[in-house]
Amino acid sequence: MIPICPVVSFTYVPSRLGEEAKMATGNYFGFTHGAAAQYSQQPASGVAYSHPTTVASYTVHQAPVAAHTVTAAYAPAAATVAVARPAPVAVAAAATAAAYGGYPAAHTATDYGYTQRQQEAPPPPPPVTTQNYQDSYSYVRSTAPAVAYDSKQYYQQPTATVAAAAQPQPAVAETYYQTAPIALSLPVAPKAGYSQGAAQYTQAQQTRQVTAIKPANPSPATTTFSIYPVSSTVQPVAAAATVVPSYTQSATYSTTAVTYSGAAYSGYEAAVYSAASSYYQQQQQQQQKQAAAAAAAAATAAWTGTNFTKKPQFQNKQLKPKQPPKPPQIHYCDVCKISCAGPQTYKEHLEGQKHKKKEAALKASQNTTSSSTAVRGTQNQLRCELCDVSCTGADAYAAHIRGAKHQKVVKLHTKLGKPIPSTEPNVVSQSVTSAAVSKPSTTSSSTSGANGSSSVGASPSVKLLTSSSSLSTSSSSKASSMSSTSIVKKVTTPKITFIGGNKLQSTGNKVDDSKMSDSAKTTPSTAAQTQEAKIDPMSEAAQTLAALQSDVQPVGHDYVEEVRNDEGKVIRFHCKLCECSFNDPNAKEMHLKGRRHRLQYKKKVNPDLQVEVKPSIRARKIQEEKMRKQMQKEEYWRRREEEERWRMEMRRYEEDMYWRRMEEEQHHWDDRRRVPEGGYPHGPPGPPGLLGVRPGMPPQPQGPSPLRRPDSSDDRYVMTKHAAIYPTEEELQAVQKIVSLTERALKLVSDSMADQDKSKTKESDDKKEPSKERALKGVLRVGVLAKGLLLRGDRNVSLVLLCAEKPTRALLSRITESLPKQLAVICPEKYEVSCSLAEAAIILNSCVEPKMQVTITLTSPVIREENLRDGDVTPGMVKDPPDVLDRQKCLDALAALRHAKWFQARANGLQSCVIIIRILRDLCQRVPTWSDFPSWALELLVEKAISSSSGPQSPGDALRRVFECISSGIILKGGPGLLDPCEKDPYDTLATMNDQQREDITSSAQFALRLLAFRQIYKVLGMDPLSQMNQRFNVHNNRKRRRDSDGVDSFEAEGKKDKKDYDNF
């Protein structure tokens, strides 16, 4: 093994020695494309070069951001060398090198900064070596034996201006521009092996391996650089007149040295370094002219007393620098993810349709919102970030990853050193937006601010190609540039043209916390936030991936045949069902799972195969519109038929009401003409009829009041039931006739009794006694007759005969005897008149069909007035006649008068109220449970339930509302109860009901409410279900239960089946 001395100089391959000498004379340090770095190593006991002075270190290229301490990535393990620097520098460097395991010797290396980008492909960087800049252009010869330089001549860089090392460079142009003393000639194809004492580094592998070495801690003697150096000072270091350049920096930064073992890429490397040298030459001219003499003197004094020959023949010559060669252009389109060979190809690509389409698609995806403009189904797509394509499923994504296109892009990115995203599927998220795509640059160069942060903000779409795969130096450089507050100076970058991509991504590996300053801590935090933000989509991707992997099984394996060539190799696959061919083996299973193949399989092989139906949006809209029109048409016909039926029913009701009213009015005015003036002290009775409306009051509708047409099936059932329970015309005529005759007869009885009383008064001798009032003041209709609540089959009506005094048995007998005589006067028909002392009433029965009965109850307001009297006279002190009638019966008759008056005032004009009360009266007659419900309490409840609603209630809604009120427990013991509004003292109208009756009625109401909810109101009403007017609508009512049998109607079958359950209804 040949030991390698760490003090290594770089040289050119002597292809054109004359031009190289001339370039060296003109202070131009270029990089030849064919140069190779020569390395030698000395033994562990190599001579340490210790001189009292050190020479100035120069940056050959533009300084990127900061100087970086790189601890000899290719350094030997036991080499102890101090490279021509003062003692403190050597000590610090030795301490730095000793911090690494496996490097026990105090090996130092001049600091090199490699600002690297993850965006481009990495050609292997030159090994990190130290470099001495001497007064002469001869290579450094050590006194130690076994020092080999491969017989190559090494040109050392002459001393140049101190300030030249501090030229700023934009952060975007982060290439292999080194920031510390750097090798003048970088290798294109390095040696295959580097032999060292303790460790061996080989390049036999073709795969690129990136090893991040933890940077050492900075020492005070470490030469560091800032982007914006304010000044360059010369300071004496030792006793000798030695000039040491001091490079100021606002923040010391460190990055990770990168060790590569892999193939080199000569064309790209040469282009990068040539462009860098061009930039350096343009920026260093003036500074070199000003400080050339002083630097040369310092370099000469640094090597006095040594065995090396110094030839300063070129030190004081300041020839005009040679113009740099034109740097080549490197074109890469980040939108299409391809590289172009030259400017013409790149221009043609930018003008091509493929690039324009991809650029337009990228802009459209950025402008797309996450809601309305999103493409249907994008939320279920897996996206490959590397190729910028979306796959509809997990199988398609897996096939894409294995495909040739993806592998080609991976290979290109690997070559360019660009970051390769993970192959894990990325679920398309509408909230993730990319950076704006910049327009392709057509100029030869682009300018940006020297500050890294400002340059990134100015042109976020520009990406520079680097040969690195690690972005730790990139993030570090940006952090250092953000902390700098020096002069902002714009510079011109080499002619490297790019098209912008989505965003700049950086991921640092491990950064030593001790090397991080306060200003440099912002970038790692930003990178951490980026990583955290990237975790969430991946977790969502894992969740959505399971949803995308459907249970569809591939079918039709036998119909996909392999097509082979003459050699028997499978060249493609052919599907006989779909008549298609494909040459990708990964697409075979996908094709077998595809919807197109499954449809063909279902059509040609297995019709029973289930294939999901995905109609187009247009077909779906057409189908929905067709269904909507059909429903509208059916609804129109249904409403029209209901309106027609309702109109016919209302016409019949109106005709009946008209003729009934005409007859009642005729009878009323006939009676009025017969009654003398003042015959009725309380006014004439109202016209005979169901409602008992007086002429002075507004006419109240009798019978079914005209309502708005029903809107529901419940309304139809209620109105149908109401029509069924409403009295027939014959019954109404019979009631009207007997009531009218009774009223007329009672009027005649009153007149007869008054005449008799007058004759008796005249015969008496006592003239001082005032004449008494009529014994009978009037007759009034009460109960269902006055309220208009008569039902079909009702034969009993009630009248109240008001007396001037308390009714007595004598008065009752007198009226009973006189009434038949007066009836015979009015009509020839015979009526049976009887007296009921228990009821304090006279009962009148007709003898012809339909037989009707009228109950005439005697009462007097005096009985109630006595109860309300609160003077000195108490009820006990008032002397009643000995044969006075039942007091409670008389009070009940007075209460019936008040109830009739209240009903006419409050309930008669309330929509649906009379109809619902008739319905409930029928319910109370049919169902024994409801028979205990007091009629007056029922009327109060219905009126309160309907009047408390927000608006008019249809019959069906009103009935449901009443059942809801009862179901809520309003009549239960302990509830609010129903107070009588016609009584001054609080009185519960439900007081006559016991607890069991209350609970039974509440339970029955709840059961009825359930029947209403299930559209079985006909069971509550005790009627048969209505037949449909049109058979087209049977589908609407039969959707809950199918027919039990073909021969029996469904409603009839249900009636038979549920008859036992609904006997109560």
From Swiss-Prot:
The keyword Cytoplasm applies. PROSITE patterns: DZF, ZINC_FINGER_C2H2_1. It comes from Xenopus tropicalis. One of its GO terms (cellular component) is nucleus. This is Zinc finger RNA-binding protein. The lineage of its organism: Eukaryota, Metazoa, Chordata, Craniata, Vertebrata. Its main location: nucleus. Residues 667-676, 755-773, 1053-1065 have a biased composition (Basic and acidic residues). InterPro entries: DZF_dom (IPR006561), DZF_dom_C (IPR049402), DZF_dom_N (IPR049401), Matrin/U1-like-C_Znf_C2H2 (IPR003604), NT_sf (IPR043519), Znf_C2H2_sf (IPR036236), Znf_C2H2_type (IPR013087). PANTHER family: ZINC FINGER RNA-BINDING PROTEIN. Residues 427-461 have a biased composition (Low complexity).
